[in-house]
C-alpha cells in the first residue's frame, strides 16, 4: 500500500528570500506597498523581487509612475544593511535604462544617493557609484551630478576607495568633466589623477588618463596638467604594456600640448620618439589617431618640426589608412611639419 510522503524540500520555483509577485498590473503596486512595510523581512523580500523586475525597462517606467522612487529614497536611510544594499542595487539597475536615468533627475535621486558615499557597507558604495556612472552617460545626468556639487566629494573618494570602486568613480568623472571641469580643477583633481597614473592597476591608469583628457579641454586644465608635471608621466605611459593606457595617454598629451608650455614640456620629456614608435606598430584606430594628433601639436614648435621632418613618410603612409579621421589627421600633420615660415 502506498504511503503519503511530504518532501522536506520546497518546490524548485519558490524562493523564500523573495516576495511573491502579484499578477499583472498589481505586481509593482503591491511591491511598493511592501517597501513601506514596518516589517523588516517584508521590505527585504520586496527589494529582492524588485531587483529582478527592474531589468525590464517597461517595469522601470511603471515603477517610477507609481512612486517607487520615493519609497526607495526613504529606504536609503534604513538602519538595516541588507535593505540599504538592495535599495542601491535596485537604483543601479534602474539607472542602466534611459527611462530610469530620466526618473533619477526628476526625483532628485542624485542627492539621496550621496548620503551613502561614506556608508560602511562596500556594496552600498559600489552600487551607488555604478548608478552615478550610468546616469552620467546621459549628458543631463552628468550635468545633474556636477550641479549637485558632488565632484569635490568624488575626487576625495577617489583617494580613499577600493580599487574596483576607484575605476567606477574615474568613469563617472571622465563623463562629468566633459560637461564642466571647473569644480574638479578647484578640488585638486589634477594632482589626484596624476597619482592614479602611477597605479599598479592598468584599468586605473587607463581611466585616470581618460579623465585627464576631459579635464585638459579647458585652458585652466591644460595649465594645471603642465604645472603639476603630469606630462612626463604621460610620456612614460606611451610605453605601457596596456593598449588602452597608451591610447588615453596619447589623447591626454594631445590636449595638454596645445599650449606652448605643454609643447616644450613634452619635447623635454622626449615624447616624439615613443609617439612615432606607436605609429610604426600599426596600432588600433584610437591609439593611431591620438598619437598622430599629439605629434601634430608638437610639430607646431620649431624644435618639434625639425625632429619630425625626416619622419614625414610615416604620415604619408597613413594617408591610405582605411579610417577617414586618421587620413585627415595625417594630412594635417604633414602640412604642419612641412610648413615653412
Curated annotation (Swiss-Prot):
Subunit structure: Component of the axonemal radial spoke complex 1 (RS1), at least composed of spoke head proteins RSPH1, RSPH3, RSPH9 and the cilia-specific component RSPH4A or sperm-specific component RSPH6A, spoke stalk proteins RSPH14, DNAJB13, DYDC1, ROPN1L and NME5, and the anchor protein IQUB.
Ranges for the ARM repeats: 16-55, 57-96, 99-138, 139-178, 180-217, 219-258, 260-300, 302-339
Keywords, ordered alphabetically: Cell projection, Cilium, Cytoplasm, Cytoskeleton, Flagellum, Repeat
Protein name: Radial spoke head 14 homolog
GO cellular component: 9+2 motile cilium; extracellular region; radial spoke; sperm flagellum
Subcellular location: Cytoplasm, Cytoskeleton, Flagellum axoneme
S-S pairs: none
Main location: cytoplasm
Amino acid at each position: 500500500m502506498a504511503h503519503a510522503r511530504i518532501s522536506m524540500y520546497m518546490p524548485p520555483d519558490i524562493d523564500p528570500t523573495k516576495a511573491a509577485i502579484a499578477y499583472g498590473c498589481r505586481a509593482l503596486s503591491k511591491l511598493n506597498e511592501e517597501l513601506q512595510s514596518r516589517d523588516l523581512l517584508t521590505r527585504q523580500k520586496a527589494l529582492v523581487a524588485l531587483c529582478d523586475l527592474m531589468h525590464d525597462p517597461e517595469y522601470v517606467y511603471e515603477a517610477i509612475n507609481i512612486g517607487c522612487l520615493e519609497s526607495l529614497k526613504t529606504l536609503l536611510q534604513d538602519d538595516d544593511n541588507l535593505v540599504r544594499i538592495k535599495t542601491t542595487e535596485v537604483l543601479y539597475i534602474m539607472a542602466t535604462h534611459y527611462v530610469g536615468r530620466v526618473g533619477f533627475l526628476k526625483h532628485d535621486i542624485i542627492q539621496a544617493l550621496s548620503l551613502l558615499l561614506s556608508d560602511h557597507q562596500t556594496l552600498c558604495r559600489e552600487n551607488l557609484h555604478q548608478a552615478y556612472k550610468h546616469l552620467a552617460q546621459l549628458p543631463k545626468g552628468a550635468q545633474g551630478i556636477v550641479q549637485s556639487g558632488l565632484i569635490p566629494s568624488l575626487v576625495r573618494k577617489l583617494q580613499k576607495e577600493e580599487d574596483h570602486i576607484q575605476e567606477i568613480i574615474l568613469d563617472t568623472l571622465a563623463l562629468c568633466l566633459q560637461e564642466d571641469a571647473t569644480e574638479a580643477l578647484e578640488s585638486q583633481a589634477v594632482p589626484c589623477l596624476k597619482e592614479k597614473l602611477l597605479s599598479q592597476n592598468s584599468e586605473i591608469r587607463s581611466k585616470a588618463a581618460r579623465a585627464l583628457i576631459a579635464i585638459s579641454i579647458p585652458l585652466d586644465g591644460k595649465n594645471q596638467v603642465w604645472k603639476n608635471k603630469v606630462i612626463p608621466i604621460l610620456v612614460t605611459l606611451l610605453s605601457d604594456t596596456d593598449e588602452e593606457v597608451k591610447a588615453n595617454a596619447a589623447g591626454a598629451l594631445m590636449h595638454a600640448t596645445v599650449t606652448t608650455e605643454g609643447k616644450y614640456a613634452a619635447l623635454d620629456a622626449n615624447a616624439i620618439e615613443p609617439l612615432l614608435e606607436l605609429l610604426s606598430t600599426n596600432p588600433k584606430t584610437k591609439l593611431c589617431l591620438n598619437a598622430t594628433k599629439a605629434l601634430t601639436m608638437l610639430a607646431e614648435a620649431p624644435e618639434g618640426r625639425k625632429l619630425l621632418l625626416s619622419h614625414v613618410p610615416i604620415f604619408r603612409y597613413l594617408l591610405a589608412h582605411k579610417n577617414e579621421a586618421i587620413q585627415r589627421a595625417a594630412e594635417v600633420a604633414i602640412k604642419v611639419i612641412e610648413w615653412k615660415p
